[in-house]
Structures are given as C-alpha cells and as structure tokens.
Amino acid sequence: MAANSTKTMIIKNGYLFDPLNAIDGEVKDIFIREGKVVSSLSGHEAKDAAVIDARGKTVMPGGVDAHSHVAGTKVNAGRLMRPEDHYKSVRKKTDITHSGSGYTVPSVYKQGYDYAAMGYTTVFEAAMPPLEARHTHEEMRATPILDMGAYMVFGNNWFVMRYLKEGDIEKAAAYVAWMMRTHKAYGIKCVNPAGVENWGWAKNVKGLDEPNIHFEVTSREIIRGLAEVNELLGLPMSLHLHANNLGHPGNWETARDSLMITSSLEPNSKTELEWAQTRESAKRKQTVYLAHAQFSSYGGSSWRDFCSGAPDLAKYINQTENVVIDSGSVPFGPATTMTGDGPAQHDLYMLTGQKWSNCDIEMECGSGVLSLMYLKSSPVHATMW
C-alpha cells in the first residue's frame, strides 16, 4: 500500500462480487473517495491514492447481519448470567483498540472487532423493547466500526392488539410510525404473536387461530395486521417474524402457515430517497422475513419422533417470492440463547435445567435468556446442525 493520502484509495485486481450491480466474480478495480465508493478517480487523485493489491482475493460489500442480539437489556442479562463466558475469550487493549471479553456474549467493544474481523460492517439488533430503547441505542453507539440499527417489537403490544381487534389498521399504523420515529427503530419485529402476552399469565398459544386471553386477538390477525402496517408505511424491510411454536416438534407447519398469511399483500418499499443508484432494483419482493428458520423447521409430533422438517418448509419457501429467511444455523459448543419469546425459553429451561432468566416489559413484550451447550452426541442438536 502506498503511504499517501487517505482521501482516495484504489483496491485493484480483486474478484468483485456485487449482486445489486450484477457483478459476479469479475476482476475489477474499486475507487474510493473520502470513504465512499465512486465510479472513477481523476488522474491526479489516482496518482495520490493509497493502493491495495487484492490480486487473487475476493472483494465484496461488507456483510450485513440482519438478525442478531448485540445490544439492550436481554444481552446484558446474558453477560451477567455468564461470568464463566468472559474467561473463555479475552482481548487485550492495544494502541488502537479497547480491551474486551466474552465468547458467546462479548462486550460491546469486542463484538464490534469480532464482527469486523469476519467481514461484517452492518448489524441489526433484532428485538428492541420501546421502554428499553434508550439503553439499546447507547450500546449500539458504543460498538466500534459497525453500522447498526434495531427492530422494535410490536407483536404483543397492548395498543397494537387493541387497534387490530377493532379492525383499525390506519390507527395501528399511526401508532407504529410514531413509536418507530420516537425510538429510532428501523423495522417491525413480531415475536410469538399473542403468545408472549399470554406468558404474563404463565400461558401461551398453540395455534395461529387461538385468541389470546385479554384482547381476544389471534396470532394470524396480528401477523396479517402488522404486515399490512409495514406495507402501508412503505418500510424498506419486510415484517420481521419470529414464528409461533418455535423450538417445538412439528412446528414447520406453523411456520409455513404463518408465511402464507402475507402472500396476498403487495410489497411497498419506499427507497427512492435513500438508495444509491444501482443496476438492479432495490425494491423488495418480500412481505415477510422468517427469522432463524432452522428453529421453525422441526418435524415429528414429540421429542420421541423428532425429525427435520426443513425440506418441507424449504419446498414452500422456494415456491414463493414473498418470503425471505435467515437460516439460524447453530454450531456445536456453548451458546447463550436469547429471545423475545419468554415461553419458548422456559420450555428449553424445563428440558435442560440450565441457567435461565425471564423478563416482562409491561404492556409491550418480554424476553428469555438461557445458557446452553449444543452437543454432537445429542440427536436433536445433530439434526438441528
């Protein structure tokens, strides 16, 4: 690299992959001016530019983790629950980096460095309670290198459920829009709709058409209503769904039926004001995002006949354009599982007996945290892997 001005840079001779510009492994140069990629540099700028020779290497946009848990109260509950986790991985302070610790739940500095080392530049916190938004933003701001955002949980919000029960989509949309603007959220998250509200009374819902206790609104109505709100507001991302019955044998059918709920909606993402010019359209075709699909891909009717339902769910997903997913794959070894689905975590606690934490956010949502070890010797874990 030339020891010269940092205002301009050229990354040369790399194999470039850029789906939005229909570039698939071509050898191209990347020109950067003041931190932004540009189409070209002037002769004077190119002469003074720092040069990185990426010959034989892959060059691609920074990775985007669309679903993670990296900031907020449940993450800190995990850090407090797992002092042993911090001994497993310790990063010493250097001249340009902070110290940090933590393996499955790293400190904010360390998680920023770890993500960057893997090539990620953007990470989203997938469950931000409105009452805990300020602290979530504090931690995201303290995380180095990464661009970050958060999804706000609405699937068990009292006001949302009341408006949907009344059939007033416009009022629900106005409420969601105000909440997102006030709390600086990026998207709408829906976690075990109707079930988390029931968990405040030690109950859950078992199906999409079972009404919850006090609002008498079903999971199906909440998913459909929030998806309609999402498109009415023209958000850049789809409704982010954590399906009902997560982690239970046979739940792939619940996941499939949940995805079918939004299939008749027309996607409406308003990206004109914020999207850079690209060769491929930035308009999304999807109306629902299924989070950590692996945990919603179980077959069988009990743990005795548990099997993978992934082929069946994948077959449906591949036949439709309204769905986008992340796999939610798990590696073997220690984990600190955390979710806005309190009853699912309690079920896991009853199976494993590991350290468990539960929290209820009044009128809004809940969460659960559990330490876990994924084992090669476990038939269930091996099937999940």
Feature locations, PLM:
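N-terminal metal-binding scaffold of metallo-dependent hydrolase/deaminase domains
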Residues: 1-48, 53-59
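Metal-associated gating/positioning segment near the N- to mid-region
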Residues: 54-139
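Short, acidic/polar
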Residues: 104-112, 167-180
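Mid-domain alpha/beta scaffold segments of enzyme catalytic cores
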Residues: 129-172
